[in-house]
Each structure stands twice: as C-alpha cells, then as structure tokens.
Amino acid sequence: MSAKYFYPTGGHPGQEQLLTDRAIFTNAYAVIPKGTMRDIVTSYLPFWDKTRLWVIARPMTGFAETFSQYIMEVSPGGGSDQPETDMGVEGVLFIVAGTAFLKINGENYKVEEGGYVFLPPETDWTLHNKTDDILRFHWIRKAYEAVVGLDKPDVIIANEKDIQPTIMPDTDGK
C-alpha cells in the first residue's frame, strides 16, 4: 500500500540512476523536487534526539524571512522536551506517518496520521515517538503577528479524517 501523504524516505540513488532532479532557488521562490530529498541533505535541530529533517523552506532574504517548513523524521524513542526554541513563533504540525505523543501546556495527546496541531506562540510543548515505527510530520513555523483587539489563538488539535470535505462549486465533487 502506498502512503497517503508524501514524505522523503532518504537513502542514496543508485550509481546507475540519472540524476535530473535539481532544486531551483530564486529571489522569489524555491522549487525542491522530491528526488533531491536524500540522506545527504538531511539536517538536525538542537534538543531533538533520534531525529533528522529535510528543510523545505527557511528564513532567507527575499524568500521566507519569517517562515520555515521542515519534514521531520523521528525514530522510535526520539523526540524533544524543548522542540521550539523561539517563543515568538506559532507552529503547525501535520502528521503524515506514525503517531506523535505530545504534551501541550501540561495535557497529553496522541496524534496519529492525518493529525493537525496548531501551536500558538509561547506554548509549552514536547513531542516524542513512543512507538516502534518512524514518525514523520511537516512542521511549519512562522513569526507570530499580534493583532490589536484580538486574543492570542488557542491550541487546535484535529484530524483530517474527522472533517467532512467541503465540495467546491462547479467541480462535481471531484
């Protein structure tokens, strides 16, 4: 069975494989083909154990100055008690494989594939993989912009499997 969501599997291309996938970077955008996400381009973050990641977007002048996106891969027993080092950012986690065990503001949560977690700034949270399977998720981080007259948003935990799709007009539900 193929995965419902994309995530890199790492590894190295065969020596006989023609490598035509190339990332493209401009001042306005970046295109990162999935074939470029191999073991050689993984990164690591401080305070994360048994975890590697692929950087999809990171702060850089002209592209994403206040925004980053990673595809995280947490091995069994891995995770972090201090995942976010900047309390001025908000974050979104989207679980694409495995199960995440989160502690958010003192409450425990088990978030499975298809799970979505919105983390407002200054949220106290941890994330661990307590299973025998690899946990993979997208982590999107953005500098929080407060709006005068609006409270800071609440934590949101949901799963796309529990949400009825909204059909767009004139698409015959396709």
Q: What is the predicted function of each stretch?
A:
Residues 69-71, 116, 137:
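Hydrophobic beta-strand positions in blades of beta-propellers and related beta-sheet-rich domains
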Residues 59-68, 77-91, 113:
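A short beta-loop-beta micro-motif enriched in histidine and acidic residues
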Residues 1-65, 146-174:
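A short, N-terminal "cap"/entry segment at the start of jelly-roll beta-barrel domains
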Residues 69, 77, 99-104, 108-112, ...:
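Long compositionally biased, domain-poor regions of proteins
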Residues 71-76, 85-102, 140-142:
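Short, conserved beta-strand element in jelly-roll/cupin
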Residues 92, 105-122:
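Short acidic-glycine-tyrosine-enriched beta hairpin
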Residues 64-65, 108, 121-147:
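Ligand-binding loop in jelly-roll beta-barrel domains
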Residues 56, 74, 102, 127, ...:
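Hydrophobic beta-strand residues in large extracellular and virion-surface proteins
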